[in-house]
Amino acid sequence: VSVEDEGDGVLAATVQGLDGHSFENTYVTNGGEPVSMALVGRKVLTYAEGLAPADITGKFTFTVTGEDGAPMPERTEVTNAKDGSVDFGMIKFTLDDFNRKWATEHPEDTGLEALADGEAAARSGKPRTVSFTYTITESGEVPGVTNDQNASRTVTFTVTDDGSGALTVTRDPAEGASFT
């Protein structure tokens, strides 16, 4: 590389002798592996003391939808188990998922070079955070059981790229079942 001072406050750099060789820098997180978190919930029946609850095994169907571009769990429709548990499986968040969301939410970010295929160049050393929101909808009926009037719940997963190669995910709510 040859650098010349043009005398106008601008330095001009010229590359010489590449002969078909080039350098390509690649930014990956977690060794290229996604970061995962389970989307689980629970169907809860409340009943007066002394009453036996109805058997609800498989009686309620839960469907998950994600906002545009959100990675989806292993299953998008499930029924509840005998204990009321609901398990959609793992959601795998990749750096590509993260970068597509970031580029959509931050088009003004000149430090991010959005590419046509949805990938984006990383901003080394600067933490970035995006959120993916999912809606879980319940359907089903059991004689003697009054369903909750609010048949939908939302769950938000926050994914952070620390800018140094680590991608992490947290969930809101953070503790217990994702939804009840």
Language-model features: locations:
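Solvent-exposed loop/turn and edge beta-strand elements of beta-rich ligand-binding domains
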Residues: 1-180
